[in-house]
């Protein structure tokens, strides 16, 4: 359906569409008045034939396509002014020669093609002002080109293979921009340059320039503003450049300049100076005189602190400063006075610190300081403390120490911060004093003005009061008048002659009107008494009294189904009829089925009701269109949810994706069995917002998985409740990218329309691109939206409605593509999802507790509870938990075993628990589960009066209690626990009743009482007990004995049989079975390796563990050999894969600490794990901070939230700064530990580190 609007289109931007093959819209030939057309990045393979009918076309862009020829159609465009076909596959033969003879042709862009020579007849384009032939393979420029194109203003020949330029180039006296970069130009002396007096841009980067082929003087080139002589290996700055007074931009990077010999008064107007990649050691002091300089690049030189002018702070206009890859150890304090600085790069230097004022630069956005190993950042001033607030939490070290209740000493480094802050506070007080004085002066001036106005107002009020008293006296003197006469005199007479005839009510009779389109329409007498229930009527009955006067009765009748406008108009016109007749009667309301007797007598008590309505309403009636069921494929791009429309069929489903089926009353979320749960959850949230915004909450939201789809889903999708027979297969291509969105803006002028595109940076549309006074079209190929602003005029709206219809029809689209109309402020959820950040997200403070979220009338009440801004970081400032001494450990072990009467052990074999042999007591396997039944004596309670009053026979008997310890290996499944709860536990409960206690423990997380029963003989082997006993023992095994915090926690755990697993702080056992029995009958050997820093008191226990536990029950013929660190034999290292580097620094054992960061309590809190922590204490739901004495690691769990990660990062920095103060002699690095890729420095803090567990699901 044609709207007839195409003939008025003056220009349109079709860039970004897919016009490959025969997809170019044929309706373009109807745009006969079109003067400009953009077809950039449209996959064109040839010039469309339709362009030959656009005879008025003046500007044509076909860049970034696949054109190999532009013959034919371009020759049929006589008014062509600009041809832009850059970045194609054009060769010289593919360019028609006759287009250059067009007298109006002014812009020619053939850059980024495959031209080997200048196109034929180019010299005939004498009216050209722009010529771009860059990025081709052109080797020569004909003399005729420069001789004839004397009107050129812009000439770009860069990135070709030119070795020479014709001497006629001097004729281009009007040339303003000349770009020749990246050409050999070995034989071009640049002698013609001084004749180009209009030249303002000269780019000759990488053109083999030397001091000999650059003119010695450029005095006549007063307009030269942009010069690029980079990548030319120049030893010094050419002398001619210093005389360019109007120079704005100078690029001399990539040369061999050692010194910048500029003097004061030169380059006064310079704004950009690039001296990167040279050999500069000093920047001259006169650089600070370049007061207009905004960008200074001096990276990759040899600058030191002395080489930077101390007065650099005078460059107040400086926004960009690059000093990377130099030899800077310090930077001048003046840099902090460059108040407009936005980007500062100081990476790859030798910086030690920075000026304190660097934090006060208001506009600084980029500060690059990486690869400065010894850099110590200055503390931020107290004035900026509010900027440290992070999620309503102040993470400054001083504030957190104050909260933790620790006061800093005067000698600490914090005191220096205070002193600096005092200076800042003094300055702030001066500023505040000046501000108050100014405010006070303004207030005094305002008081004087108000006082003067009050006086004037007082005088005026007195005069007004006297005038009112005088008027009241005059009114009292006048006689009272009839109020009815005043009303009659002031009544506004309205002419009703256009509505009612003159003879209406002038004699006896009855008149009936029906309301039609807001006005009464007189009815024939034949229809009196017939009333439609959807209409309203006006009735006038006039009778003559005996005195001869006329008496009127006016009624208005409302049908049961009459529309609002008919009822209102009947009442209004009844009053108008009374005024028209100058009647004194009242208007009476009559309703269907409730008429008065007086009204019924008018029609002889015979009224006929007819269903329906005979007249039309004055309102426009619209019928809500039927809902169209649509299917969308959900995708996630960052935090945004993208809904891609797909055909409504089973074939569109893919098991790797989630889909949203919008069936109107029900919104279905379908998830394939390979889809991600996060995508499904976000699709569900999108459906919730869609239902709330577009459906007012009337739709139901249902979710279903691929394996279980209810019949209702198939009914909505296919119209049949039965599940389709065919399988759902993967069909969406890998790496599928939806077609790029295009945003058009509708422009209207005197008799023409334009449809340009709004530039979308990186293809991202934002809400602020829409304007209330405009009309926009968002085209996503499968859907097209017309957005109308509130302040758009009527003609613009009409033009947008017609253009969106034409745009929908002329471009090839899927059959399911739809057109939607959006109004500003009432946009649909689907339209909003096309724009980044356009969503109704309520900001939430995740650090608040449930109490603070309650609705409290006064916000101060919440703040007093200290919940809104609460963060518990006190654990970071506590001292490390001291290790238990050997004597204390012995005493604790004795106390824990004092009340033990009996201990029975069981192990899970198959699905049953069997009694564990006594010789295996203390041996555990990581894939098994064990049960230990312990009977403890309970001491009787003593009376307060003492025991003397009791006889020996009356002494209370000893009681007991039973504790069942369930031990689960790290690699064991939960089936063991289920078998225990259904088999053993019921039996134990039946026997011991209320004296039973069940304690479940995991590997390396046992309590002290349980460990005390094994008296340091606690061995954990890898694998399963039954399988290892039958098939194991035939290969070398390495065990590490380690006690964390207390010797009670002594465990011997099997580790990888490699040399790098050794540690000088602990004892190790290496079990080596021999392939053949030795002559002395030994079948193997167990080496007990004593680390040089291990506790000598642990050596005896290491020998016992080796002989009792490491040597298997059938390995009594293994000999035990003690080895001191450094005295190993060749056999020892050979079994471990050769001698390798292992951990010899044992100091980390005394400093290791592990902190847990979480907000599970409703606020952010940090707690410290016990010294006896293990690998499984790294919780995937939280963030951990590990300190090993040399580095502070931040470990991020796989399921932790972004909020926890950000807060933990700030807290780790607080801890790092705190430890720098406490232990300045042992500085720590701040590092990140990636889950699953932890470094050896991180892993050494955990006993027997192994592969990380993967979370279920």
From Swiss-Prot:
InterPro entries: ADF-H/Gelsolin-like_dom_sf, Gelsolin-like_dom, Leu-rich_rpt, Leu-rich_rpt_4, Leu-rich_rpt_typical-subtyp, LRR_dom_sf, Villin/Gelsolin. It comes from the Eukaryota. Pfam families: Gelsolin (PF00626), LRR_4 (PF12799), LRR_8 (PF13855). GO terms for cellular component: actin cytoskeleton; cytoplasm; nucleus. The keyword Transport does not apply. GO terms for biological process: actin filament severing; actin polymerization or depolymerization; barbed-end actin filament capping; myofibril assembly. GO terms for molecular function: actin filament binding; phosphatidylinositol-4,5-bisphosphate binding. Gelsolin-like repeats lie at residues 523-600, 640-714, 759-832, 1168-1243. LRR repeats lie at residues 6-31, 32-54, 56-77, 78-102, 103-126, 128-148, 149-172, 174-195, 197-221, 222-244, 246-267, 268-290, 292-315, 316-338, 339-361, 363-384. May play a key role in embryonic cellularization by interacting with both the cytoskeleton and other cellular components. PANTHER family: PROTEIN FLIGHTLESS-1 HOMOLOG, VILLIN. This is Protein flightless-1 homolog. It comes from Caenorhabditis elegans.
